[in-house]
Design a protein with these regions (language model features):
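C-terminal "cap" of GNAT-fold acetyltransferases
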Residues: 36, 208-263
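Acetyl-CoA-dependent GNAT
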Residues: 41-44, 48, 96-154, 165-166, ...
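A short beta-loop-alpha structural element at the N-terminal edge
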Residues: 68-80
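Helix-loop element at the rim of GNAT/NAT acetyltransferase active sites that forms part
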Residues: 82-98
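Conserved catalytic-core motifs of GNAT/GCN5-like acyltransferases
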Residues: 131-134, 181-184, 196, 201-218, ...
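Conserved beta-strand-loop-alpha-helix junction that forms the acyl-donor binding cleft
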Residues: 156, 182-192
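Conserved acetyl-CoA-binding loop-helix of GNAT-fold acetyltransferases
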Residues: 157-170, 193-197
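Conserved GNAT acetyl-CoA-binding A-motif
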Residues: 172-184
Length: 263
């Protein structure tokens, strides 16, 4: 990918987001966004929070009756789990049992200690989420991240998935991640369209990657470079630390996601 400015990258992501959700967009002025107000104050407050609670302090916004994207925290684990649970009965995820509430909360805590996790919320109920997580554990892989996105039926076809992905990609780029990966059970036409619309390239297909739901399933690997590869790259920042140090930038990304969601 070319060495684009944040503005260039944002324009590219928003263009892809509009393409992925063109049927969801409507003309006219942006509607007010109750509950989706700028989060600069919450993010600034996170500066003085302990490291394991910075993301939580940065995440909270009042509940909204409109579809709204915001940062997640461990307190959202039950709502995120409710969206995720139905997918366990499908080949979309290779997990075959729904994790307990305690185990799933621990999972969200671990994710939020390093990476951004976003939720789509409507009327105080979580209807979708997206997050980044470690691709491989060896230190030399630290500039890569794997992405996941899940939507409840109530949020599907409304542009929530593409807006979650747009915001997630922008935040990851800000923290210093260079390449992102989508690992998709094949076939999955909706996810395949989403990744193609965001400029991901099909890196390869892993045949018979897993046996679940009574059958063998292939897995398609998608990749997108989101930042240049310098000869001496700085290590990527942990998201809570970045959000604490740069609250306005993170707040701006979330605000843009909500503005585009309600155009």
């Amino acid at each position: 990918m070319r060495d684009a400015s944040l503005r260039d990258f944002t324009a590219e992501s928003e263009s892809a987001s509009a393409e992925a959700a063109s049927d969801d967009a409507s003309a006219g002025a942006m509607a007010p966004l109750p509950g989706c107000a700028p989060m600069s104050s919450q993010l600034r407050a996170a500066r003085n929070a302990p490291a394991n609670s910075q993301a939580s302090a940065a995440a909270r916004t009042p509940a909204s009756s409109q579809l709204c994207i915001r940062l997640a925290s461990a307190d959202d684990a039950d709502g995120i789990r409710a969206v995720y649970a139905p997918f366990v009965d499908t080949p979309v995820t290779f997990e075959e049992e729904v994790p307990s509430r305690e185990a799933y909360r621990e999972r969200i805590v671990r994710i939020c200690e390093k990476y951004p996790c976003l939720v789509a919320e409507e009327g105080g109920r979580i209807v979708g989420f997206a997050y980044a997580h470690e691709l491989r554990e060896r230190i030399a892989f630290q500039w890569n991240a794997e992405l996941s996105v899940y939507l409840a039926p109530a949020a599907q076809g409304r542009g929530a998935g593409s807006r979650l992905y747009t915001a997630l990609l922008e935040i990851l780029r800000l923290t210093g991640i260079k390449a992102v990966y989508g690992v998709v059970t094949s076939p999955n036409p909706a996810s395949e369209r989403l990744h193609h619309s965001f400029g991901f390239a099909l890196m390869g297909v892993q045949p018979h990657a897993g046996f679940t739901c009574g059958a063998w399933h292939d897995v398609a690997w998608y990749v997108r470079e989101i930042a240049p590869f310098e000869d001496a790259p700085a290590p990527p920042a942990l998201f809570p630390a970045y959000a604490s140090a740069h609250p306005d930038q993170v707040s701006e990304v979330i605000a843009r996601a909500n503005e585009s969601l309600h155009l």
